[in-house]
Amino acid sequence: MRTLGIDYGDSRVGIAITDPLGITAQGLETVNRNGSDKIILRKIDEIINEYNDIEVLVVGMPFNMDGTKTIRAEVTEKFIHKLKCKYNKIKIETIGNVDFKF
């Protein structure tokens, strides 16, 4: 069972994958969004087809240092909704990360 990690940013999206046992992860690539989720979804399709044992997609959810959602979190939630509609047979989870911008 592999997990695909997605760090969804304004201009770029980082993609990482675990080993077949789900123990370690390594970065696969960084994809330029060019203002479109179609590019990212196409890349995720390619990866899912290449690694046919991906069972979970994990998306980083940005939070402020006080634990509240950032403005970026709303955009990320919309992207997660697209993932859930497109990949309804793959479990989709979020993981919180803190926005350290000052």
Language model features: what each stretch is:
Residues 2-4, 11-102:
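Phosphate- and other anionic-substrate recognition elements at nucleic-acid/protein interfaces
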